[in-house]
Amino acid sequence: MASIKGIVIPAAWDQNGKIITLAIATDDEQEYLIETRQIFTKLKSLLREEVVVTGTIRQTEKNKIIEVKSYSRRQ
């Protein structure tokens, strides 16, 4: 498990402009896509706020992805 700190940002939208994917943008300009759908709504309520998320990180050819196990607002 790894913890990352950053800001919750939108990462993709549907054809109507609705946010369908979130990411965490870190201080070192990395972006981690949020994989965990169950947490999507809760993290969406923290859009543009600083958080700490803990979970499993994996890398694809194009993206870093985190499966979030827990999160909290950054103090």
Question: Could you tell me what each predicted segment is?
Answer:
Residues T26-D28:
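Acidic/polar residues in short coil/turn loops that connect beta-strands
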Residues Q38-T54:
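Short nucleic-acid-contacting surface segments enriched for D/E, G, S/T with interspersed K/R
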Residues D14-I24:
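Short aromatic-glycine-enriched beta-strand elements
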Residues T21-A23, T41, L47, S70, ...:
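Domain-length accessory/inserted modules outside core catalytic folds
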Residues R58-Q75:
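OB-fold/S1-family single-stranded nucleic acid-binding modules
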Residues L22, E49-T60:
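Short, surface-exposed secondary-structure junctions/capping segments
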Residues M1-N16, R48, G55:
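Structural detector for short beta-strands of small beta-barrel domains
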Residues Q30-E35:
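A short macromolecule-binding patch
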